[in-house]
Design a protein with these regions (language model features):
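Acidic, small-polar-rich N-terminal luminal/periplasmic segments of exported/outer-membrane proteins
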Residues: 1-146
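Outer-membrane beta-barrel translocator/receptor signature
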Residues: 98, 102, 111-114, 120, ...
Length: 204
């Protein structure tokens, strides 16, 4: 395999040079033996994607189904109920047991992720808990060697506000210790009086 990284930060395109969800190895899309998609950080930022359901609506081969207050993803006729974070699975609601574990809509804000890898089709050969429909893997941002900081603010109708701050860099002169912090604050109103929600996320 080519010695390449799966990270998409500072990559100004909507394409990634590699992904690892299929085999656990950083393979280029051409080397990957399955149908795959990658939602890069550039696309997340350019299109203002803030949650997993919105990202999956923009992903080829994935159908987003919302019913009774829950969100589920469908791929090749099967529900994808194992959503990975850095390659580690987290069960969402509607799994084989039928127990409501976690709604996919409630997954962490996408501002903390570098990219989202999507594999269409079974991955059980390389992952013990693979599903026939496919696998979704959200890869988190990592600390950088060089200092960098960014902040953004958005405003919309019905008192909708969103603020994101991201700071990263080395913590010592030898650059052997690094850190990163991402903070998000969301506030959403409604056309109805006294209806709204406010949420915050901190990652570091």
């Amino acid at each position: 395999a080519t010695d390449i990284s799966t990270r998409t930060e500072r990559n100004s395109t909507y394409k990634s040079s590699a992904m690892s969800t299929t085999t656990g190895l950083a393979l280029s899309p051409r080397e990957t033996p399955q149908s795959v998609s990658n939602v890069t950080m550039t696309r997340i930022e350019d299109e203002g994607i803030t949650d997993m359901s919105e990202a999956m609506r923009k992903t080829t081969g994935i159908t987003v189904i919302q019913n009774s207050g829950t969100t589920r993803f469908l791929s090749r006729g099967f529900y994808v109920d194992q959503i990975q974070e850095d390659g580690v699975s987290s069960t969402v609601s509607g799994g084989a047991s039928g127990n409501p574990y976690r709604d996919a809509q409630s997954l962490t804000d996408l501002a903390i992720y570098d990219h989202i890898e999507v594999v269409r089709g079974p991955t059980g050969l390389t992952q013990s808990n693979g599903e026939p429909g496919g696998t979704i893997n959200a890869v988190r941002k990592r600390p950088t060697v060089d200092f960098q900081a960014s902040a953004s603010a958005e405003a919309g109708s019905w008192d909708t506000y969103r603020t994101v701050g991201d700071i990263s860099g080395s913590l010592n002169e030898a650059q052997t210790l690094r850190g990163r912090f991402v903070g998000i604050l969301n506030k959403k109103g409604s056309f109805k009086d006294d209806v709204g929600e406010q949420s915050g996320t901190a990652y570091g």
